[in-house]
Amino acid sequence: MNYTNAEFELAYEEILKRILFDKIPVQNPIAYILGGQPGAGKTQLQKIIFRKNKNVIAINADAYRQSHPRFESIQDEFGDDSPKYTQPFINEIVERLISDLSDMKYNLIIEGTLRTADVPLN
């Protein structure tokens, strides 16, 4: 499902504002890359990281899915298949967050299945 650049920018800025709420950049940022199949323990590792360092931003693609400008209509039309229609938007959001937050020197947790190495390596 298509979205305009303006819609993307609006959604991106809202997400960015929300995740930066209580975080500060650091001189030497750390990126934690957690990958594995569902049930592998990624969420538990994330909790351990947060206990040790509260100044970390977790990048979680599923948390941004509802920010798609057509999320509700996609849900209504496609139901359980809706994630494949919102995935291009999510990919763009995640890639931009990783790039921008890395440039701004924030600590990050990047979680996913790591089906490909493209996003983490970039």
What are the roles of these predicted feature ranges?
Residues I48:
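Active-site signature of alpha/beta-hydrolase-fold catalytic machinery across serine-
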Residues L45:
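Hydrophobic positions on the alpha1 helix immediately C-terminal to the Walker A/P-loop
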Residues F21-P29, L101-S102:
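Phosphate-binding P-loop
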Residues Q37-P38:
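The conserved Walker
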Residues M1-K23:
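N-terminal pre-Walker A segment at the start of P-loop NTPase domains
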Residues K42:
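Conserved lysine of the Walker
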Residues Y32-I33:
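Short hydrophobic/aromatic beta-strand immediately N-terminal to the Walker A/P-loop
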Residues K54-N122:
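Conserved nucleotide-sensing/catalytic segment adjacent to the nucleotide-binding pocket
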